[in-house]
Amino acid sequence: MIKRLQELIDLAQKNKPTKVAVAAAAHNLVLESVQRAVSLGLIVPILVGKEEDIRAEAERIGWDLQGVEIVGTPTNKAAATAAVDLVRQGRASVLMKGYLHTDEMLRAVLAHDTGLRTDRLLSHVFVLEVPTYHKLLLITDAAINITPGITEKAAITQNAVDLAQKLGVDQVKVAALSSIETINPNIPSTVHAACLSKMAERGQIKGAIVDGPLAFDNAISATAAREKGIVSPVSGDADVVVAPDLDSGNILSKNLEYLAQARMAGIVMGASAPVVLTSRSDPPRARVYSLALASLLCADCGQ
């Protein structure tokens, strides 16, 4: 089981470099990340965006771009579309969000005839290495599905479970989060969490033990669970936490990143190819971890 994000890089370096289409690449943080991933032998990039801006930013960070393919586009929207098309054509195996808004990227990914849709729901998973936690923690969904219902949450959970299994977790422990641990019809997230737990018992969510509703404290702390009298196979040992909605998942993830010094990677599951999706403000380190994760997913799928 992978317990540290550095292990993603170590494992990915054993494979051939993955071809990555980078949408809206003309930004120093994006290019620094890509350059670092290239130097580590993780990827072969195709940079998509305004060519003159890409070259100017690359020159600023001291990257001469010799041998690097550039696909010129006039706008970020066009860059997202072109990068998706590179993946559809098989010229790249991974799509990476550069310096553009998430909704611009997702519109290209979700386009009915020209995107990367499959029969699965797309959802985002953050993989966090939190210094005070004993293993990697996956948080979903903090970037795509705004207010998912029970059906959507089941798909979101399954996507995260599948990712956890690819990281070497055999029996994935999932905490379906709410603000309290008992079912209250006035708090919909408690009902959703209880349904997810029962769905896992009935085999509708596979490969996981799901318990909920659980508040975050007793999801990640066995001591907190004992103090509240909660007996759960998940408490204190969760691999995945399913947030009630996008707002809470996003706030939780960034809270851990900025206040608990967590390191993170971000990936979109459910598309026809891995999609690296991090915040525009994330440091190069987060993007490199995400590229390593995407590379491993490609290798696992035989791409």
Q: Language-model features: where?
A:
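Anion-binding alpha/beta catalytic cores of soluble intermediary-metabolism enzymes, centered on
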Residues: 1-234, 239-244, 248-303
